[in-house]
Structure formats: C-alpha cells, structure tokens
Amino acid sequence: MIELVTDSPHPIHLVDSLQNPKLFASLSTDFPLIFITNTKLNALILPPLLDLARSLGFSVETLTIPEGEETKTGDTFLSLHQQLTDLNVPRQATLIGVGGGVILDIAGFVAATHCRGMPFIAIPTTLVAMIDASIGGKNGINLNHIKNRIGSFYLPKAVWICPRKLSFLPQQELHHGIAECIKHAYIADSAILPLLQDPNALKKEDKLSLLIKKNCLCKASVVQQDVRDYAKRQILNFGHTLGHALEMLFIGKIPHSCAISVGMVLETKLSLSLGVARSPAILHSLIQDLLRYQLPVSLKDLYMRAQIPPHNCDQILSALTYDKKKQNTPLPPFVMIEEIGLAASFDGRFCQTISKHILTKVLEEEFYAMHNN
C-alpha cells in the first residue's frame, strides 16, 4: 500500500512497507542512491532497503554517522560532503535520509548544498520525524549548541512514512513525538486531541497511522501557505522559542520534546499574561494533555530529569538572544495561543514581540514555584 497523503508543499506517502518497488519508480537507475543514516539504523532497518534498491538496478552507497543531537555539527556536515566528493557523486544522484530528526536535518542540508542541490528523499523512523522534521524542507546543523543556526529551506522530492517502523522504538520515544502532535492540535487543529486521549490506543497500527496522517496534513497545510517562514508558518514555533533556549542551556541533557513541552506551557502562560489567551482553561488542558504522556510541564520537571543545578532567569534571557527569529529587539517574538486550535494573529503577523519585564515575571514565577514546592 502506498497512500499519497498530500503533494503540497511536497509529496508525502504513507506506506505499509518500505520494501515496495513502486517507491523507486520515479528514480533513474542511471544515477546512484546515497543513503545517510546512523550506525544503529544501518544494521536495523537499512539492509532490506539496500537489497531492494540493488535488485532494481541501482548503484548504492551508505554513509553513517553516530546517533544523537551532538552529531548535528559542522564537522559531521563537512565529513559527509568530503565522502560524497571522494565518491565523485553527481548532482543527479538521489540522497536518501533514513532516521529521526537529526539525520533528516543533516541529510537535507547536505542534499541542499552538494553541487548546489541534489534530489532528496526523507524516510523518517521516529514519530517526531514523521509528523514534523521530514515535512516542509527546513534543515540544518547546530553551532556551539545554538539550534539550527546554519541551514536552508530545501523541499524533499518525497517523504516515505512507514508507521510500522515505530515498533522498533521504546514507548518513551513514541511519547517524545506526541509533544509535536499536541503542538499541532493547539496551534491549528484541535481535532487531533481526541486521538490522543487514550495512550494505549496508539499501540494499534490503524490508530497510530491516523494520528500520523492528521498531523502530516496539519503541518503541510501550514507550510504550503508560507514555505519560507515569513508569516503563517511561524506558528509552528509555538513552544520552540523558549524550548530551544532551554535545549541550548541543558546541552544535550534533555530530549528536544521535553524542552518543547515546557516551552509550550511557558508560552501559554505568556499568552495569558498578555490577555491573548481567552481562558486559563487552555493552560489547564495543555498541562493535562502533556502529563498524559509523561511529558514535563515545568522547569522543575526539567531539572529533576536532567539532574543538574538550576539556571537562573538571566541565563534563559541570554540564550533567547540567539534565536533565529530575533530582529532589532532585545528578545525574539513569541507565538501566542488564542484558544485551543488557534494561534493568535496580530495584524497579519503570527509572532508577538514582548517586553523583557513580562517574560521575566513569568520566568521568576516559575523559578519561585520550583524552589518553594
């Protein structure tokens, strides 16, 4: 089965198996396939895919990198480029990224820059990669722990999503992807939330496939309105402004999803402080939805997970100054929630600049609660 979920802003296919020759039908055997993955997936998932490609007449090469966010560096990026150069890979070859968000971010950036661009196919193997990282063409690497400081917009030729590959993952890893599902529900499509009410239901393939499909459609719908991230696409940054600042400070000691979960809670508190959010019930609902999947909802939760001494308010404010959205203001603009399923719009803009005083007040209240509860 190959189901076309959408073809805008690029084709996204839901498949029941990656061992389907029809997936390769649009590719020419005149040029090689270059797979980029990590060392674990190279042994776990890739062999049958490589065998199929070879049986169809393709020349195949595999490049592997270590697992983890710490791999997402300039050194890794240049090493992959050097390997492509050593192999004398032509720009007509197709680069296929197989893995989670880290792999797809790096592989997409390599594809965008090798010989000024080569075809790229994403095969996401985690939930967050299936519903978020593989969609929309954003790619890049970190610089000195600053998230995605160097990167580009480069749409993939296709995304192939096989929900069955999630069976390789522990339950906790699946829950990490739920954070992005919840984000989509709160900024654009509240109809996603009923699919998240029973965590056990997601153990069923049909329920999980439906969740993936709805989230793919949600993100694709937002992206196709604003591929270059100048307007509507900015709502996808909900939770990520503070979340990325926290990731920078924690230096790999917390998963991306945990930072984003707390980021969403804090940015909803900002929305309430500014009178943008229509009801405190939005915050209560968000917290319950996150807790259902054992995701953190406070700074205290993060520090308990990371087992490191707390930072202070000034350190978080300083980390925020490196945000990519920052303009000629002390702080970057923030996405605000108006109601569940609706990100706020400010005269056609979807991010709001706030005063340092208001953010400091929200953060100080959070630190006070951490030290006194």
Curated annotation (Swiss-Prot):
EC number in record: 4.2.3.4
Residues given in the record as NAD(+) binding sites: 67-72, 101-105, 125-126, 138, 147
Protein's UniProt keywords contain Amino-acid biosynthesis: yes
Binding annotation for Zn(2+): E180, H240, H256
Catalytic activity: 7-phospho-2-dehydro-3-deoxy-D-arabino-heptonate = 3-dehydroquinate + phosphate
Group of enzyme by EC: lyase
Requisite cofactors: NAD(+); Co(2+); Zn(2+)
An annotated GO cellular component: cytoplasm
InterPro entries hit by this protein: Dehydroquinate_synthase, DHQ_synth_AroB, DHQ_synth_fam, DHQS/DOIS_N, DHQS_C
NCBIfam families, per database record: aroB
Protein name: 3-dehydroquinate synthase
Organism this protein belongs to: Chlamydia trachomatis serovar D (strain ATCC VR-885 / DSM 19411 / UW-3/Cx)
Organism ancestry: Bacteria, Pseudomonadati, Chlamydiota, Chlamydiia, Chlamydiales
Gene that specifies this protein: aroB
